[in-house]
């Protein structure tokens, strides 16, 4: 049933998008993934919203979502003009020609990366991947968001590579809905095994006091994953798209405070960070991984 539900989610987000070549908009609608913290996120990016309004000379409305699927649907259905998408959500969205990749976050002009990890609670008898393989049938497994790279795609691909097909190898598989929910479910021993991101999830939850060091035990860490893509609706005018891109590329210099507030959702120190251009081809590795997983063939 959960496998069928996930396939239905993927089918839903791959619905057709608008076909206008030069969409006119009086208010720029920016989709933001806020996870489980919409109020805190809104406060942190308030300055960035004001910066965009000043640079673009138009009202800007931020739309907060608790999942990536809503962002993909929003831009595909012409309800959003700008979105920040996880690598996997970006790949899913590009199955329909609805967006233009603009920028990604960098440190010292170098694209930032992050990692996925598979974990259990600190006192668990599962200490490594061999233990996981041996006891999988006794364990419940939790992914984060269906359209998350680190919280779903990458760990799913890894588990399959070692002979563990999630739906068939584990006692039960669920989607928690977000990175914090995945980690807290395991911390509270409601789920045995979880999947999430290290730098952008676990470390932030530790800093915010949601989890203490040692309450989760890491079993596996992935290779580096390319970071999110900030994209524009392809139906916007070329002039507006270029203005949006320029505003993002210049924000760290023109309004450092607004920039720092925006990226503080993930990074505590923005002094060496900035946005740099990103390109579709940089996400080909994520595409290849997605296409290699039998359960995700519906993205084609």
Show which residues each predicted segment covers:
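Extracytoplasmic small-molecule ligand-binding "clamshell" domains
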Residues: 22-91
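Short helices/loops that flank or line small-molecule/ion binding pockets
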Residues: 69-83, 92, 96-97, 114, ...
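C-terminal motif of bacterial Sec signal peptides marking the signal peptidase cleavage site
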Residues: 13-16
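Bacterial signal peptide processing site
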Residues: 18-20
């Amino acid at each position: 049933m959960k496998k069928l539900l996930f396939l239905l989610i993927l089918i839903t987000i791959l619905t057709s998008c608008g076909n206008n070549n030069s969409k006119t908009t009086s208010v720029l609608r920016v989709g933001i993934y806020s996870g489980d913290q919409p109020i805190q996120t809104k406060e942190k990016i308030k300055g960035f919203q004001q910066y965009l309004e000043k640079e673009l000379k138009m009202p800007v409305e931020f739309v907060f979502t608790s999942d990536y699927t809503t962002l993909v649907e929003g831009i595909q259905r012409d309800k959003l003009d700008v979105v920040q998408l996880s690598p996997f959500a970006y790949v899913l969205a590009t199955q329909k020609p609805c967006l233009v990749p603009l920028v990604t976050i960098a440190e010292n002009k170098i694209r930032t990366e992050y990692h996925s990890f598979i974990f259990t609670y600190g006192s668990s008898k599962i200490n490594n991947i061999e233990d996981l393989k041996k006891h999988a049938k006794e364990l419940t497994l939790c992914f984060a968001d269906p359209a998350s790279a680190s919280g779903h795609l990458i760990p799913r691909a890894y588990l399959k590579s070692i002979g563990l097909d999630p739906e068939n190898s584990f006692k039960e598989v669920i989607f928690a809905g977000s990175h914090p929910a995945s980690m807290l479910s395991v911390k509270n021993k409601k789920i045995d095994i979880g999947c999430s991101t290290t730098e952008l999830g676990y470390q932030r939850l530790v800093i915010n006091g949601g989890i203490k060091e040692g309450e989760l035990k890491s079993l596996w860490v992935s290779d580096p994953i390319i970071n999110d893509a900030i994209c524009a609706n392809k139906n916007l005018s070329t002039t507006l798209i270029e203005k949006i891109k320029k505003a993002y590329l210049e924000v760290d210099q023109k309004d450092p405070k607004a920039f720092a507030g925006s990226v503080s959702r993930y990074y505590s120190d923005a002094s060496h960070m900035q946005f740099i251009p990103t390109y579709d081809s940089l996400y080909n590795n994520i595409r290849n991984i997605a296409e290699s997983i039998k359960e995700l063939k519906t993205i084609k």
